[in-house]
Amino acid sequence: MHEMSLAEGIRGIVEDVARENGATRVARVVLEIGELASVEVEALRFCLDVVLKDSVADGAAVDIEAVPGSGWCMQCATVVPIAQRYDACPQCGGYQVQPTGGTEMRVKELALGD
């Protein structure tokens, strides 16, 4: 389960930002996760519950915002919505769709406390 290593990476980012800003507590963590990022959101939530314990973010609210998947269809030369990496283009039915959005995962916002 790679979600555990993702959660550990998030903890590292959160701790670094808190330290850089002199914060002793993080009240809220907002993540953006693309629908095409190959992340099981519920598994990540579970892992975050585990790795954030005894850290500056222990007890912090974790909000996850989904970023819809999109891709560039080479056949009809347009950006189209896609739910999975290998979906057909919803306009022309072609399979030459290059993902352009929804592949990202990032820490979008942190609410720091004293």
UniProtKB/Swiss-Prot annotation:
One of its GO terms (molecular function) is zinc ion binding. PROSITE patterns: HYPA (PS01249). Gene3D superfamilies: 3.30.2320.80. GO terms for biological process: protein maturation; protein modification process. Transmembrane segments: none annotated. Zn(2+) binds at residues 73, 76, 89, 92. It comes from the Bacteria. Keywords: Metal-binding, Nickel, Zinc. Ni(2+) binds at residue 2. Belongs to the HypA/HybF family. Involved in the maturation of [NiFe] hydrogenases. Required for nickel insertion into the metal center of the hydrogenase. HAMAP family: HypA_HybF. This is Hydrogenase maturation factor HypA. The gene is hypA.
